[in-house]
Amino acid sequence: AQKRISTAALLPDIKGKVTAERELENHGGDAFKKSETFEAQFLVSWELDLWGNLRWARSASIAEYLQSVEAQRALRMTIVAEVAQAYYELVALDTELDIVKQTLKAREEGVRLARIRFEGGLTSETSYRQAQVELARTATLVPDLERKISLKENDIAFLAGEYPNRIARSRLLQEFNFPETLPIGMPSTLLERRPDIRQAEQKLIAANAKVGVAYTNMFPRLALTGGFGTESTSLSELLKSPYAVMEGALLTPIFGWGKNRAALKGKKAAYEAELHSYEKSVLTAFKETRNAIVNFNKIKEVYALRANLERSAKSYMDLAQLQYINGVINYLDVLDAQRGYFDAQIGLSNAIRDELITVVQLYKALGGGWKQ
């Protein structure tokens, strides 16, 4: 709307006016004298943009409009990124809960075996009680994870503009696919994609245009006004009495107590501030992108290492359980192996989650993703 208003200011303003007037006069006599006047006219006013004042104002309005467009795009991109990250975190919690429930079953089996061996005199009561402690400790993790899952579902519903409800999902974290490489072009293409940089650029353009407006306000302004119409004392004779009026007005500042110069100085200061803000936005964009790329590459290394750790911990736990059944080691060694495998599983799940989140962060850093 503001863009259209500023554009219209460059064009002549045309208005129409129709009037009818009736007067009754009595100058001391008994009868009233009636007089009627009918008039139809077009009024035209036009400010000539001699110094570019109106053009600068139009440029500022267009830039401010584009600011709002980029702000909307930035908000949409942020919401998409936040929803994606929250969803990956939710599925990671699902995976962790699944791991805990599997571990809980293993702990229950461990308690059963420890009780049988204790009652058979093969082990002490300590091993049996320790197995019960581990079972109880693992069981406490279930309601806490269920609480976190419900809260995360509420977060996603809020971001989606919905009332809290269950979020539909059908995948475990390990089933998501993520890119092996990042086909990113030259960093300068960031300037073409990131809405925050585009918004900062439009703010800079608007600030520069406002400097132009303040500067041209110190020069005279020429306005033309005209009227074209017809006037008559009889409605039937209205079109037979045309007239036309044209005048010009030159308005120039003479003594304004330094108001215009102060305004110009203020707009220049605002421009300098927007220039620094633009430079900061560009530097922030490159920093965030670089951080996202580093995180993506390093998290892949972390994932590979944790996957290897998970496999090794699984082999160690299987061996420890076999040796315990054969009486080679005590139950504390089995518990230690089980704890190690549990931690390795959670660590691997977190690595997958972190890798997916880095893709989301990279999507946001690149202003909405990249082309394959």
Which sequence ranges carry the predicted segments?
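A glycine-/polar-enriched beta->alpha junction
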Residues: A1-P12, E25, Q41-A60, E70-M77, ...
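Bacterial Sec-pathway N-terminal export signals of envelope proteins
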Residues: A1-Q2, E175-I205, P253-I254, E279-V282, ...
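Transmembrane beta-barrel strands of outer-membrane/channel proteins
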Residues: G16-R22, L224-T230
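Residues that define the transmembrane beta-barrel architecture of outer-membrane proteins
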Residues: K34-F38, P242-A244
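Short terminal targeting/anchoring segments
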Residues: T126, N330-N350
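Metallo-beta-lactamase
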Residues: L145, P195-D196, E274, A351
